[in-house]
Structure formats: structure tokens, C-alpha cells
Amino acid sequence: MDHDTPPAPSPTVPRDRTIGRAPRRPSRRTRGRTAALGAAVLAAVTGALPAPSAHATPPGPLIRADTDRDGLLTPDDDAGKAAWTRERGALMLPNIDDDQRRCPVAGPAGARLPDDRLADCGDAADPVLDGTADLADLAPVRITAAPVAAGATATVAADPASREYVRIFARRHGRMVPLGPGDRLTAGELRHGVRLGVEATDFVRDPAKWAGFTDLVLRVDRDGVTTEDRVRLRVAPLVFQHDLMPIRRMMTADHTTGPAELERGTPYDPAARPRPVKPGEAEFRRDLRRGLDRAGLPAPLFNYPTGGDVWTQDLFKTAYASIPAPGGREHRIGVIVRSADVMPGTATPDFPLRDASRSAFALLRGPGTGVIQQYDPGRVGSDDSLYYGSFSSTGNFGTLPPYTWRGHRYPVGRIVYGGTAGKESPDVSFTRMLAAQGYQRPLAVDTSWLGVGHIDEFLSFVPARNDRGWVAVVADPGLGRRLLEELVAQGRGDEPLVHGIAPGDTEDPGLTVAGALRKPSLTRGTEIARKGIDAALRTLKEQAGLTDRYVVRVPALFGEIDLPAGYPRRDLVANYLPAAANGVSTGTGVYLAPRQHAPRTAGRDVFERAAERALSGTGTRISWVEDWAYAHHVGTVGGEVHCVTNALRGLSGTRPWWTERD
């Protein structure tokens, strides 16, 4: 179902910036292993599994699923139903939402559940259908009516390799009940036809374990003769939202409440305005509200309890899964994908992940929305989490909006993230899961030159008036330096570099425009960032056709980070002035970007004016948000508007993911 409003809160229920249901059985959806994938990866990515041996259409009952993807079950679905290709083949949802809010978020006496136990719940975790909404999440399958003799019986079962990932329900005696491999359908049922429903219990995590396909096999026994018919289904992939989708609810951190309080059942209203407790928080919220109003988005800010963690973007990504519905529609469930960020210093085997991301289970999991996590437990306790763990934060993941290029069609875009082939990369089991979906083929760019390692430090996307419908907003340190050189040429080199901020709240009090151009860390930072951004753009051009016509460059100023002796990473930079590229597209023609605090000319910030001019031809306007104290000047590397927000976006205008042609 489309859920255009987030689930109401249950009544019972860092980013390292400094360098009535009974307890459910485990559901196999938390951890992955590192293994050679071989042919299984190819199967998951291409959707090409070998079909069973061809056989004549058996007389009598047939099993039918939505092979032609029109949301209906008709004879048109029967051709080629035993195979599955990207163009044709039936689909099923991973039924991971919690339609009756029966998933526990705490143990006995309010004890905190371990991360894996907290995630091990959803509608598919047991064989109970939770009302009409849960029923709607089942893929429709039918056994056609046929005139069989009185003694005829039949079974329907998933193939053994997929059986633990698939559950079949049958309508019997007026209700949908689980149908096991040994359960027999009667002659009377076969004469009338049998309505079935199928759910997957999970997404594809590791193709070496399960590539997402199931063969449903109907065996009919009549007078000692057994006939067989079958249909193949694939689980719908996890689809990341993209920045052209309009924001439904803008999320930002509530520092007055933490996840443990939600888990203990403290009542919580995410629309109630919390008391600002962080420096600059009130100003940040004020400007964020103004920007949303300007974008025509009047819904209240959606407050997310973090207990003090400001980096909301690094906690999870918003996604969805869908299957065809009648009338060309999609039937969807929302998915919150928890960050695989194993926290240095605090991670334990029971609580390995970022604590603030746990609030998603109590606050966001519910009707039409599930929460998943995927990480390598072997990273707990490793020194690598201290130096490289931030690459796994979800602020390091984005989505190229939809595009077509050289015969490739990506109707829901492509995942893009920062990483290398080495340690400066996200959790391997997490990126393997993304690749295993077979859609939105992930693309990695090197972000090892950034102190925090996140792609959102220099890249975002906004709607635009061109054939793709969007442009990339990219940080340009060369442009930032040229703007400062122009000020020096005008005789203004002695003016302060940072405008509107008390000197004591800057990294280098008293630094002038001319001094910034001479400062070695800024000169070196500009060069490191320029090379890193140019390399990223080359990758995007080669692999996604992102030529200059689809790039808007905004000024930036990067500084090299002074690293301690023995630190294993070298030549790292951070944004010295707030990064205009680190903003949020509302999807409605407004871009929320951090105030620049650069020098001014004729009363206008020179960096802000340059950014506005750069975007002027796109149809997207900038709304400036004050984030210096709240985000930019925090820790060693800081962050900006995108880093400290998250968004639930509207899905009503999406194009079907299954029309992708990679």
C-alpha cells in the first residue's frame, strides 16, 4: 500500500565527527557472511536463472501468478511463467512491515533488546496474517478451477532451496491460512479453484544463500497419475528513494529524548516541537521551517529521538519495495535501512550499531513500513571501525535520480556511494546486499580524501529543466578560491574571511581573505579536494553519462586536516566554510543549503550569490539555512544541512522499478 503519512508513534513504545503477538521466531534477516558469490551474484543481478526443463502444459488445474506484471491474474500470465526475466516474471513483496504493531521493542521489565533481536521481527516472521493490510501485502497466485475426479488431491510448495524464505497462504473455509508442503488440497477445492497468496520473508541479502527466486510447484494426484505445473517468482528489490521525490516529512534530531525512552514505552509525538538544547539548534530549526514553507511543504518537522546525536542522515536511508497492482499502479511498503556503522569504543556484540538508529524500530516500524539492518559482526571491536567506520554511515549513500543513457534505462535511479576497493569503503556485507538487489546498480566513487569520507560532502541532486530532469550540485574548490582572489584584486584582502560569526567560534580567528589564500592548509586542501572531486566526476561521466551539462558547480573552500602522528589515513580534508553542495532537495523546486558566511559585496554573501547564479537556470531556488553552530562547527570535520536531516519522501509518482533495463 502507499502510505503517504508516516505511521503514528506506538503508544507503548555518531557519525564520528571527531576523527499481542507472542515473541517471534528469528527471521534470518540481520547478518550476512563474506563468501564467494560466483554464479549466484550473476543470477541475482541479471535475473536469469535456468528454467526447469520444458514440459507440456498439464491438463487440469494450473498455477497462475502475475507473470505479465499488470496486477491481474489472467490467461495472459501463463506463457513463460516457469521462467523469469527482467522483462517478464511474477513478483512478491518481502513482507517485513508490522501492520498490527505487534513487534516488541523491549524485553521483560523494559530490558533493552539486542540489536539483532530488535530487528528480527516483521509480519513475515510468523505464519499469522495481521489483518487486511497484511493480506494486501501477499502476491496474488491462483490455482485455476478444473473438473477433477472425487479422489484427486494436490499440493503446492516452494522449491526446497527457497522454502525457508517463502510462505504460501491458501483461502480455505473462508479465510487465508498457511499452506505447508505436505498440506493437501481436496478435489472440491480444485474444482472451484484456489486463491493463494505468497510472501517473501526477507530481501536478498547474500546471493550465495538465496538469490531471491522461488519456484511454486503444483502437483496434482489423480487416479495414481501425478501431473505438475509451476510458476517462478522473484522477491521485489530494495529501492532507495531519490531527491526528485517530494518530501512528505522532514526529519531532524530531538535531543531531549533517546531511543531507550521510546523502547520503555514513553509516549512520544514526533510533531511536538522539542526544546532546543544544542548550540544553534533554534536557528537551524527556524530556517529549516522557513525553507519548507517556501517549498510548499507545511507539514510539521518530524522529530526523531536521538538522545544527542545530531547526524540524522547517518542513521538510516529511506527506501521502499513494490509489486504491480491493477491499473498500472504499484503496491508498496516503505523500508528504513539502518546504518551499518559499527561504533568505535561503544560497540558490543549485542549492541554493535549506532544507538540513535534504534529509534527507527519504535517510531517508524509499523503499518506499511519495515526496518532492516545488515552489517558484518566481525567488525565489532576492530580498530578499523575507528579509522574507517564512518564510510558505513548512510550519509555516504545517495541516489542518482532516474535517467536513460546509451540504451540503459534507470527509472528509479542508481545508488551512488563513497568507497574504494580498500578499507576506505562501507561495510562489505551491506554493499553486497545492495548489489544483490539486481536493480539501481550501485556505483562507487572514491571519497577517501575526505576526513569523514561521505559523498554528501560534495555532491547532491536537484530538479532541473533539462532532458534528464535534474542536475548534480557539485562543490567546486577552484571556484571558491577564484572568488577570494577577486576580492583581493578589489583591494579587500584585509577583510575577515568568515562573516557573521564571532571570531572565537571559527577555526582561525582573525583570518583574512588574503590570509586564506596564503594559508598552507587551505591551499593544500583546495588541491586535494579538486583532484578528488574531478576523479569522482570522471567516474560519474564514464559510468552514468554525467557530462558538464548535468553539473552545477557551487563554490567551496576545503582545508587540510591536521592529523595526529600514527593516524593511518593521510591527506584528508574537510569543508572550511559551510558546503553549499551538502544540502537537501525538497523535490518541489527548493534546495535547502547552509548559509555560507563568506565575505560580502554590496550586502550579499559572495559564495551565496555565486551558488544562486549557478542554479538560476535550473528552476530550483535556494533557501539558506543557518547551521554553523549546530552542524558545521562541530567536531573536527563537522557537517551541514543534509548531514543533520533525513526525509520521508512521497512515492505516488514513482515509475516501476521493473521497467529498468541495465
Where are these regions (language model features)?
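Histidine/cysteine-enriched polar flanking segments
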Residues: 57-662
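Secretory targeting and sorting signals
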Residues: 1-56
